[in-house]
């Protein structure tokens, strides 16, 4: 048993996704800010990114994480089959851009019916060998319905729930190794040491590190602004 807890027949998904982003997701903004800071420290110090790499935020919602990562100096692109690109027009990913070094998928795996298929398809489409993602994990027996907010029953959108061993098994199916710390999970052919990941994503590193990184890489905020103005005229 791998600890994967899922809904057998989520027949209500069309109704649940009449709005791609649930109105009850009041943590969306703060979550994206926090995740952007953690991902930045991991890419810069653990994966040695120095501004040359290309990255994809899969199932990127309105484009908030992509915008934040570009503001920090990373060459991020957006893709989402179900949501409008409101915040990074002009930076949607397509095959002509070439392969990506890594893919992010923030709060996505709990929404999919086939996580192995999703991870494989996402990595194949981006030409990447690393996926960085978040999803809340549970330990031991499945939590009682009234004891775990992450079920989010009223929204109907969360249909799959994981333990650490679930993610290990998922990665093994695809030849990937799991690294996990402080709510950030990485499946990769070149795994990050868990102790390093824990250090890079701790409270102080994820607060102070991104501002150093932004100075070193150079923010894309204004260059993107100028590019958008040129496209308007």
Residues covered by each model-derived region:
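Residues that recognize and position ribonucleotide moieties
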Residues: 160
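Short "lid" loop at the C-terminus of a central beta-strand within the Rossmann-like core
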Residues: 137-141
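Conserved N-terminal segment of class I S-adenosyl-L-methionine
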Residues: 1-102, 106, 116-125, 134, ...
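A short His-aromatic
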Residues: 107, 111
């Amino acid at each position: 048993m791998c600890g994967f807890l899922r809904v057998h027949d989520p027949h209500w998904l069309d109704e649940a996704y009449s709005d791609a982003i649930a109105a009850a997701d009041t943590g969306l903004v703060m979550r994206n800010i926090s995740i952007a800071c953690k991902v930045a420290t991991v890419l810069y110090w653990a994966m040695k990114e120095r501004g040359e790499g290309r990255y994809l935020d899969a199932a990127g919602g309105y484009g908030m994480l992509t915008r934040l990562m570009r503001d920090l100096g990373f060459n991020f692109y957006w893709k989402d089959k179900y949501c409008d690109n409101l915040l990074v027009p002009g930076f949607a990913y397509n095959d002509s851009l070439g392969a990506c070094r890594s893919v992010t998928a923030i709060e996505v795996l709990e929404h999919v019916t086939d996580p192995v298929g999703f991870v494989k398809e996402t990595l194949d489409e981006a030409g990447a060998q690393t996926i960085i993602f978040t999803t809340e994990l549970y330990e031991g027996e499945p939590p009682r319905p009234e004891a775990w907010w992450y079920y989010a029953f009223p929204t109907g959108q969360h249909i799959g729930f994981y333990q650490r061993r679930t993610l290990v098994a998922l990665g093994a199916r695809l030849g990937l190794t799991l690294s996990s710390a402080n709510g950030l999970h990485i499946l990769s052919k070149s795994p990050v040491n868990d102790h390093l990941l824990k250090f890079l994503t701790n409270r102080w590193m994820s607060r102070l590190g991104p501002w150093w990184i932004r100075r070193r890489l150079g923010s894309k905020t204004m260059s993107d602004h100028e590019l958008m103005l040129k496209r308007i005229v």
